[in-house]
């Protein structure tokens, strides 16, 4: 029997079958070993085949081919990956300029990974009602930067619902991953979009200006107007994986554009003579923050810095 994985609590997966039943399912032990290097071989959004047993639960026996997915390094194992979600129409990264701060390095790592796995991304800047003049200027700069690169951006105040109607229109009839740091307001947004779902919302640590985890598992939530939201635990750091050094610049759109003019085909854009990317940074044609994010991913390969909370 075929179905869609709509929830992952760690050891159990909820599979919604084609006839509308929700079946609690597990993976057989030997299934885990079949060329799967991720900590979670099955992800929310996967289409699977299950074998239902007499107790009413099931074993997952097959994962159908994915059209795409978003992946990051596992938080506890340096050589393993964690699949955040699969078979997405789009991802929305919830960003806050403050309360808590979302760094450009975090944003760019997420965008690069989405580019690598062909997942369209929109940036949604939340909590706009809380920003002072300095925060507002930073917000405007970020929107100008990412819009110029080609990423759609929007603003939102989940608390007052300003911008919520536009968000609903963007989500209609699509499977969307909602991601971002803990504390950026994902649970509040979902509570506004799906009345009655009653996700727990968390506070911001005043000492660290970071959010507390409120979502502890991944779940696909049906939207009233059609479509699904995939809610995942808030991410502190975003360690990239499965990218060869020579490919990383391909996932930074503006770097890739200028890299075609570099003197050497294998240019890493760090120090080589005749590097068009470095020249573009010096000329102000490529943002320094984006270039630093690119270098930080290269540094991952040499110094295993993925554990830092970017």
Swiss-Prot record:
Main location: cytoplasm
Keywords: Cytoplasm, GTP-binding, Hydrolase, Metal-binding, Nucleotide-binding, Ribosome biogenesis, RNA-binding, rRNA-binding, Zinc
Entry binding sites for Zn(2+): 262, 267, 269, 275
EC number: 3.6.1.-
Pfam family name, one: RsgA_N
Gene3D superfamilies cross-referenced by the UniProt entry: Nucleic acid-binding proteins (2.40.50.140), P-loop containing nucleotide triphosphate hydrolases (3.40.50.300), Probable gtpase engc, domain 3 (1.10.40.50)
Amino acids binding GTP: 126-129, 180-188
EC main group: hydrolase
GO biological process, one term: ribosomal small subunit biogenesis
SUPFAM superfamilies: Nucleic acid-binding proteins (SSF50249), P-loop containing nucleoside triphosphate hydrolases (SSF52540)
Cofactor names: Zn(2+)
Record-linked InterPro entries: G_CP_dom (IPR030378), NA-bd_OB-fold (IPR012340), P-loop_NTPase (IPR027417), Ribosome_biogen_GTPase_RsgA (IPR004881), RsgA_GTPase_dom (IPR010914), RsgA_N (IPR031944)
A GO term from the CC aspect: cytoplasm
Domain CP-type G: 77-238
Superkingdom assignment: Bacteria
Cofactor note: Binds 1 zinc ion per subunit.
Cellular compartment(s): Cytoplasm
GO molecular function per UniProt: GTP binding; GTPase activity; metal ion binding; rRNA binding
Cited function: One of several proteins that assist in the late maturation steps of the functional core of the 30S ribosomal subunit. Helps release RbfA from mature subunits. May play a role in the assembly of ribosomal proteins into the subunit. Circularly permuted GTPase that catalyzes slow GTP hydrolysis, GTPase activity is stimulated by the 30S ribosomal subunit.
Subunit structure: Monomer. Associates with 30S ribosomal subunit, binds 16S rRNA.
Family the entry assigns: Belongs to the TRAFAC class YlqF/YawG GTPase family. RsgA subfamily.
Protein name stated in the entry: Small ribosomal subunit biogenesis GTPase RsgA
Native organism taxonomy: Bacteria, Pseudomonadati, Bacteroidota, Bacteroidia, Bacteroidales
């Amino acid at each position: 029997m075929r179905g869609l994985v709509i929830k992952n609590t760690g050891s159990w997966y909820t599979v919604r079958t084609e006839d509308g039943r929700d079946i609690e399912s597990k993976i057989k032990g030997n299934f885990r070993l079949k060329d799967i290097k991720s900590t979670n071989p099955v992800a929310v959004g996967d289409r699977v085949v299950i074998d239902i047993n007499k107790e009413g639960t099931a074993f997952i026996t097959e994962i159908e081919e994915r059209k795409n997915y978003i992946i990051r390094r596992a938080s506890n194992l340096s050589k393993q990956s964690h699949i955040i979600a699969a078979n997405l129409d789009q991802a929305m990264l919830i960003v806050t300029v403050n309360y808590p701060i979302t760094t450009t390095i975090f944003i760019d790592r997420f965008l690069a990974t989405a580019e690598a796995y062909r997942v369209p991304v929109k940036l949604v800047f939340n909590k706009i009602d809380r920003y002072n003049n300095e925060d507002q200027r930073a917000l405007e700069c970020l929107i100008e930067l990412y819009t110029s690169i080609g990423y759609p951006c929007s603003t939102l105040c989940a608390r007052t619902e300003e911008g919520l109607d536009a968000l609903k229109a963007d989500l209609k009839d699509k499977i969307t991953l909602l991601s971002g740091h803990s504390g950026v307001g994902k649970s509040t947004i979902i509570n506004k979009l799906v009345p009655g779902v009653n996700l727990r919302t968390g506070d911001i640590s005043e000492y660290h200006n970071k959010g507390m985890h409120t979502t502890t598992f991944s779940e696909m939530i049906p939207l009233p107007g059609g479509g699904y939201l995939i809610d995942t635990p808030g991410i502190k750091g975003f360690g990239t994986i499965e990218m060869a050094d020579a490919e990383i610049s391909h996932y930074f759109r503006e770097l890739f554009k200028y890299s075609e003019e570099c003197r050497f085909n294998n240019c890493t854009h760090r120090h080589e003579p005749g590097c068009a990317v470095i020249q573009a940074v010096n000329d102000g044609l490529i943002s320094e923050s984006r270039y630093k994010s690119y270098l930080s991913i290269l540094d991952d390969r040499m110094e295993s810095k993925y554990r830092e909370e970017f």
